[in-house]
Amino acid sequence: MLEDYYPSTTSYYHGGIDDDLYTAKWGMVMTFLDLNDSSLTPFEGTHFALIGFKSDKGVYINNGRVGAVESPAAIRTQLAKFPWHLGNQVMVYDVGNIDGPNRSLEQLQNSLSKAIKRMCDLNLKPIVLGGGHETAYGHYLGLRQSLSPSDDLAVINMDAHFDLRPYDQTGPNSGTGFRQMFDDAVADKRLFKYFVLGIQEHNNNLFLFDFVAKSKGIQFLTGQDIYQMGHQKICRAIDRFLEGQERVYLTIDMDCFSVGAAPGVSAIQSLGVDPNLAVLVLQHIAASGKLVGFDVVEVSPPHDIDNHTANLAATFIFYLVQIMAQHS
């Protein structure tokens, strides 16, 4: 039995029910699935599993604005309203949440990793609704556990921050996940392939820039680079990064976008990547056929305005699933 795991029992769609797939919405199509069901066997074809990670413990430790614990429900509510375009050949299963208010951050990350591995064993592509960006390490661990030690797994992070902070004194938090991935790779004598899109210089100290400069395998584009380059040059840079790689894990921190587009985040951003450009870049990553799982993190509903941020996060999920279904 999976620890800290609670299957879904609540529908987030409250509109009319229509049996016609031409007019169906996500909330009408999504089906509940219990990962603890021992009778389940691997699914055939391309299907997705949606799981919430109800934790912002890492945000609290990192002195951010707490509230991301509420985001899985907020994102589900927005996603449920969107039209369904994929017919009956693709399924999105809502498998529930990882939740443990009295559990440690490390325990919850471990529980998420076990749930992710279970999804992968069932041939379901994981979609994780964070939660703080501590979500990423649990997601990454689960993906790695589903692979052999020699298998590659590149990481693309759309984020204003590197999240490569040391954690030897403070312990893990929402800003250390990718350093933990890096350290795991070093321990396993693997190259950590990591590409960050949207870095803001005023959000990252010189230690982090120096660490990146000395670390083979880590690349980044600043928000200003992205503004100047346009999506075609960005996509070519991503292609170069993914050359020779078979798998990529994608994580989207909603603080990559300005407060005008994403007011409800743990750490607000004055500057930020244009969401329309982001959609084009995300679609390109999905079209590579290498995307094995993704998450959206750091939505903080108590700080949101008219669900702008939750809706934007749901929009990214919509477009990623559309393209992944066509190229997996």
UniProtKB/Swiss-Prot annotation:
Enzyme superclass (EC): hydrolase
Checking CDD domains in the record gives: Formimidoylglutamase (cd09988)
Q: What is its EC number?
A: 3.5.3.8
Q: Which UniProt keywords apply?
A: Histidine metabolism, Hydrolase, Manganese, Metal-binding
- Bound how, and how many: what does the cofactor note say? Binds 2 manganese ions per subunit.
Does the record's keyword annotation contain Cell wall biogenesis/degradation?
no
Transmembrane stretches, by residue range? none
Q: Which InterPro entries match?
A: HutG (IPR005923), Ureohydrolase (IPR006035), Ureohydrolase_dom_sf (IPR023696)
| Cofactor(s) of this protein | Mn(2+)
- Sites binding Mn(2+) 1 sit at H133, D159, D163, D253
Pfam families membership: Arginase
> Recorded GO terms, molecular function?
agmatinase activity; formimidoylglutamase activity; manganese ion binding
Provide the binding site for Mn(2+) 2.
D159, H161, D253, D255
Reaction(s) catalysed (UniProt annotation)? N-formimidoyl-L-glutamate + H2O = formamide + L-glutamate
- GO terms under biological process: L-histidine catabolic process to glutamate and formamide; L-histidine catabolic process to glutamate and formate; putrescine biosynthetic process from arginine, via agmatine
In which pathway does this enzyme or protein participate? Amino-acid degradation; L-histidine degradation into L-glutamate; L-glutamate from N-formimidoyl-L-glutamate (hydrolase route): step 1/1
- Could you tell me what this protein does? Catalyzes the conversion of N-formimidoyl-L-glutamate to L-glutamate and formamide.
Q: Which family does it belong to?
A: Belongs to the arginase family.
The name of this protein is Formimidoylglutamase
Q: Per the UniProt entry, what species is this protein from, by scientific name?
A: Streptococcus pyogenes serotype M6 (strain ATCC BAA-946 / MGAS10394)
Which lineage?
Bacteria, Bacillati, Bacillota, Bacilli, Lactobacillales
